[in-house]
Regions:
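Conserved catalytic core of sirtuin-type NAD+-dependent deacylases
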Residues: 1-171
């Protein structure tokens, strides 16, 4: 619990313009899913509906003994140890979420990859399931997939997406 409080503290985090832009894209019907490695719940807080959290969420906790779930202050009646519903180093990802992420990637005609170095596996590996026309990478640094992308934008994701949504609303 001390590690979670100290190292994985998400208190005070708020959605930014990038999160809000994704909500707007979802409302326009052009965004079908958000697949994220983040564990901060900011996509849901901002209003996205179909969020696939590959690494889980610090907002959900569960009992290792009986499986009962609760929030951060959850204390299980069975006396079991509770932990956050996040994938820690060396643990397997939730297969149901992985399967849905793969399905969404296979169905997408455009994939926006943002704010990731694409070096964390197995998440970076899932790009191989994308069969669509447009791979767009928005990142402030180079990635190993830049050469395969239709468009690479080296800038801040929040700024780029805010401007993109602004332009889409004009058309």
């Amino acid at each position: 619990m001390e590690y979670v409080e100290k190292e994985l503290n998400i208190n005070g985090l708020k959605p930014n313009k990038g999160h809000r832009a994704l909500v707007e894209l979802e409302k326009m019907g052009v965004l079908k899913a958000v697949i994220t490695q983040n564990i901060d719940d900011l996509h849901q807080v901002s209003g996205n509906k179909n969020v696939l959290e590959l690494h889980g969420s610090l907002k959900r906790w569960y009992c290792l003994s009986c499986g009962k779930t609760g929030d951060k202050n959850f204390s299980c009646e069975c006396g079991g140890i509770v932990r956050p519903d996040v994938t820690l180093y060396g643990e397997n990802l939730n297969q149901d979420i992985v399967n849905e992420a793969v399905y969404q990637l296979e169905q997408a005609d455009t994939l926006i990859v943002a704010g990731t170095s694409l070096t964390v596996y197995p998440a970076a590996y899932y790009l191989r399931y994308f069969r669509g026309k447009n791979l767009i990478i928005i990142n402030d640094m180079d990635t190993q997939y830049d050469g395969e992308a239709t468009l690479v934008i080296k800038d801040n994701f929040s700024y780029v997406m805010d401007k993109a949504v602004e332009e889409l609303k004009k058309s």
